[in-house]
Amino acid sequence: MDKFKVNLGKKPDFKMEAIICLYDRKWNQVRAVTRSEVKYGKSREFLENEFSRLALYRDTVIDEIEKSGFDFSFLDRFVQPDVEKFPYLLRLYFFSGKNPDKVVSDEEVDALIGDFVADWINETVEADGTEKITGIEELYRTLDNPLIAAEDRMLILDTFANRKRLLSDLRAYFSIAVPVLENNFHIIRAEFEVYLREYEKITDWRDFYDYYSIRFDKDVQQLDVTLSVLLFNKIRSMTTVGRGDYSSVGMRYNELKEWERIALVSNGVLLEYMKALSDGTRLRMLSELRQRKMRVKDIARELKLTAPTISHHISILLRIGIITASMSHSESGVCEYSVSADRIDDICELLSKLK
């Protein structure tokens, strides 16, 4: 596999790796591409000069990053034109990992992580009028903000972690998601229990942010849109000793929307279901609504959230039919909401076909 690694200057605990990848629109795959594949590939007519051009592009990006003092804002204007010229993606992975030759205090690590995230979201934070992002609930609200570009949401999600709040929400994921889709969770349940136990043992942030490398196994090339990928893969990478979080840049917004469109065609409505179920607040709402019909203000009171926040999440769940609305018998003009058992059965059926 053709790779290029470089340390990020004065950020010794962060490493960067650029991997040449191919997005195969016909088969909806993203996979690493080697020089030999390009030269001798049989499924597509890969040209050697095309690969060399991409390799030069990759090295130029690395060089630009170094020259800019690791200011990544130039990527928006730099990546897009080349993505349109050929079907390759340059994926830049930023690793937060331990440096065995350097002793770093917890405060230094926290500051390093905070500065790294701030470099990426500073403009977004100012435009959004938000002073700071703290805790997993605030993170959810940020990710739901339609003004934030898709690639920025991916990056914020991948680089942000608050251990105390995250652990609490992991338990919420586990206790709520499992009953909702219990028939399809037996494998995920066992795996997740192991990861959660390992995560609870961690006492040093430097162990939490360990080196994590993306593997492109030749037998696992298809990007399967499954519950384990969308709901638990992110948690797994953040909760397992020996792994860390990563961020990728290169798939621009329009390309991401195209990928989602293809995935929806290929997998029916499963992607939309899983995106809705991958939010902790919505899972907690479903847990409450499984017991009885509830109004917005009742749900807000139970979850200790504001009514506008609940209304936002309800609109998403209503759109894909996971919950249904009916008029209240006790209060004129007010809707009550409940879980659609039939739609949950549909989701379980779709999941079972992916095994």
Where are the model-predicted features located?
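Beta-hairpin "wing" of winged helix-turn-helix
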Residues: 320-329
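Short capping segments at the starts of secondary-structure elements
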Residues: 280-283, 289-295
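Residues within helix-turn-helix
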Residues: 296-297, 308, 315
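A short acidic, leucine-rich amphipathic alpha-helix
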Residues: 285, 298-304
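Helix-turn-helix DNA-binding motif, specifically the short coil turn and the N-cap/start of the second
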Residues: 292, 306-309
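N-terminal, charged low-complexity regulatory/assembly segments
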Residues: 1-219
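C-terminal regulatory or interaction extensions
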Residues: 186-270
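Conserved segment of winged-helix/HTH DNA-binding domains
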Residues: 334-355
